[in-house]
Amino acid sequence: MDAQKKFDLLSMGEILLRLSPLPNEKLARGELLEKRIGGAELNVAAGVAMLGLHTGFISKIPDNKIGDFANNTLHYYGISGDYLLRDTNKDARLGIYYYEGSAAPGKPAVVYDRRHSSALSLTSDELPDEIYRSTRAFHTTGITLALGGAIRETAVDAIRRFKEAGALVSFDVNFRANLWSEEEARESVNRILPYVDVFFCSETTARLTFGKKGDLRDMMKSFTEDYPISVVASTERIVHSPKCHTFGSVIYDAKQDAFYEEEPYRNIEIVDRIGSGDAYIAGVLYGLLGHNGDCRKALAYGNAYSAMKNTVPGDLPFCTRKEIDRIIARHHDGDGAEMDR
């Protein structure tokens, strides 16, 4: 890590409380709910921390026991809460989402209850000026922009100020139709693309939200022609059933004018797919930050981390760098041993 920087990565967004019925149970029928902490941007910070880099999270949480639960999760993963603000308002709350898993032919379902959460009131005035000089990289997503209100403008301002301070800026479009329209997403994301260095965008989003034409590689490269983006990453997931997926990705390095791709991870046994896209981003950012911008490393860590996240419950990844290195080696060498021993 740069000796002058306190963090390798700072991430900004809303922390969510996830409530889920027991496996194979329905929200409309089950009486018990399991609670976990998650959120797209937090998932990335946790993943990068698990791989050995120093991360921190920027948000606002209620000053109550639910906020304590969120804060304790950060501590467990080794994520700094230096910029995790506490909301003392009597109406302070953590956003909630309910997740119902499913087996074929059904599909998983999500219900959100996140309006008026504490995170949405976060303003730039609440953040110290030194924060922008404290990190090598900054990450946020289109979800944070989609939430609107104060946090949207705070995120836009943060992207600009982190970029001006010399940080690598990472942005994941992560389009959610239940949060905003494609037109609103396009207008908001276009505001920040001049400041983005590492851009994550799916093929579907590139076509429908940004109106891109041609094949995937043409669309990825066009983002770097329209804006000073250095790296574009796009994932591909084939859903064979709710319990069996294939996952791979493509990364474009504009400086080298080169695309990177590898054999996808096939027939992944799905325990919980939530957060697997964020784990991919964590792996890519670790590869770039930990290996001097090496896109081959970024691809390998991104694909492996995402594949493994699918195999553990909850939003947050839980794989060490040693485990991921072993998975990568097996994937590349074709080691089919049944058990480590």
Place the predicted regions along the sequence by residue.
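Histidine-anchored nucleotide/phosphate-binding helix
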Residues: 40-50, 155-161
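Conserved phosphate-binding/catalytic region of the ribokinase-like
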Residues: 2-8, 160, 213-341
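Conserved N-terminal subdomain of the carbohydrate kinase-like
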Residues: 54-142, 324-341
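Positively charged, low-complexity intrinsically disordered leader regions
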Residues: 1-26
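Alpha-helix C-terminal capping segments
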Residues: 43-55, 76, 287-291
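Conserved beta-alpha-beta core of the PfkB/ribokinase-like small-molecule kinase fold
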Residues: 137, 143-245
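Short catalytic helix/loop segments, enriched in acidic residues and glycine
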Residues: 25-44
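A short, aliphatic-rich alpha-helical micro-motif
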Residues: 4, 131-133, 190-193
